[in-house]
Amino acid sequence: MAIPKVGINGFGRIGRIVLRNALVAKTIQVVAINDPFIDLEYMAYMFKYDSTHGRFDGSVEIKDGKLVIDGNAIDVHNERDPADIKWSTSGADYVIESTGVFTTQETASAHLKGGAKRVIISAPSKDAPMYVVGVNEEKFNPSEKVISNASCTTNCLAPLAKVINDTFGIEEGLMTTVHATTATQKTVDGPSKKDWRGGRGASANIIPSSTGAAKAVGKVIPALNGKLTGMAFRVPTPDVSVVDLTVKLAKPTNYEDIKAAIKAASEGPMKGVLGYTEDAVVSTDFCGDNHSSIFDASAGIQLSPQFVKLVSWYDNEWGYSRRVVDLVAYTAAKDN
């Protein structure tokens, strides 16, 4: 089967890390990038140098108005309106929508006008079908032209929640994500009309925040709809986050059996998506980790046979971007 050709709209954190992952995974080929705010020279610079993931280990050049990475020429567009991007001229059948702006079916479907067959939104969506690789991708229907890869936190939480619910049953639960800083935050205190706390300086504060990640699990795993909710604490670290899932179980059990169930899933049906460790790890140990979720067996605690706190790490940039690549490749295979 031919490798699917892909366009990326929005060359920010996720757009750039998706490209790095695509070059490593080799399951998709990026043939075009659109960003109205980044010219070609700056695009090459931003891709080559990364404060979190390090310098790109390969060649980055500009030739004939194209971005050339390791000999692969990528067309560059600078359109503001997705409907104006000529994806077809580059042969891009699939578009990764990573601006964070066009997150509904209506707005993201504008890419279809330029020749794309399908749009994969790298963010949660209010109305597009959401898929978490390793959890519910088998429900994908090729007739769906706009889909969402959900959020990085949902991608961490859903595999863990699925294993626990399938094995022991979840009656209800609360999630907290201790989340690394992202681009929407402020370097120093600044205006943030909708979220006053979110306007405070990212490097100086632990900032309580809202997140729809836990509720979104109910869309991905219908059996958990209405059973989970959660919140976030934004912390002054550049990357890698951690989920704390505290649940009331339907079936009494012990922590060793919980560990065994998660370990079995990590070595079986969820291999590559769900990881497992018993080491004394900290956040930087997971920078660049491909997994969506890495269960920290030695960090969890159990209060009673039906009440337990589980801890799972995730690289909210790298691991999430790898799943975006995986979802594109999966849907493309279903088209053939």
Curated annotation (Swiss-Prot):
Stored InterPro entries: GlycerAld/Erythrose_P_DH, GlycerAld_3-P_DH_AS, GlycerAld_3-P_DH_cat, GlycerAld_3-P_DH_NAD(P)-bd, Glyceraldehyde-3-P_DH_1, NAD(P)-bd_dom_sf
Sites annotated Activates thiol group during catalysis: 179
Matching Pfam families: Gp_dh_C, Gp_dh_N
Chief location bin: cytoplasm
Domain of life: Eukaryota
Binding annotation for D-glyceraldehyde 3-phosphate: 151-153, 182, 211-212, 234
Positions in coiled-coil regions: none
GTP-binding is among the record's keywords: no
Residues where NAD(+) binds: 13-14, 35, 80, 316
UniProt GO MF annotations: glyceraldehyde-3-phosphate dehydrogenase (NAD+) (phosphorylating) activity; NAD binding; NADP binding; oxygen sensor activity
Signal peptide residues on this chain, from the entry's feature table: none
Active-site residues annotated for this sequence: 152
Catalytic activity: D-glyceraldehyde 3-phosphate + phosphate + NAD(+) = (2R)-3-phospho-glyceroyl phosphate + NADH + H(+)
Metabolic or biological pathway, per its Swiss-Prot or TrEMBL entry: Carbohydrate degradation; glycolysis; pyruvate from D-glyceraldehyde 3-phosphate: step 1/5
Modified residues (Phosphoserine): 59, 125
GO cellular component: cytosol; fungal-type cell wall; Mcs4 RR-MAPKKK complex
Keywords per UniProt: Cytoplasm, Glycolysis, NAD, Oxidoreductase, Phosphoprotein
Compartments, as annotated in UniProt: Cytoplasm
Cross-referenced CDD domains: GAPDH_I_C, GAPDH_I_N
GO BP terms, alphabetized: canonical glycolysis; cellular response to oxidative stress; glycolytic process; positive regulation of p38MAPK cascade
Enzyme Commission code(s) on record: 1.2.1.12
Record-stated family: Belongs to the glyceraldehyde-3-phosphate dehydrogenase family.
Subunit organization: Homotetramer.
Protein name in the entry: Glyceraldehyde-3-phosphate dehydrogenase 1
Organism field: Schizosaccharomyces pombe (strain 972 / ATCC 24843) (Fission yeast)
Gene it is expressed from: tdh1
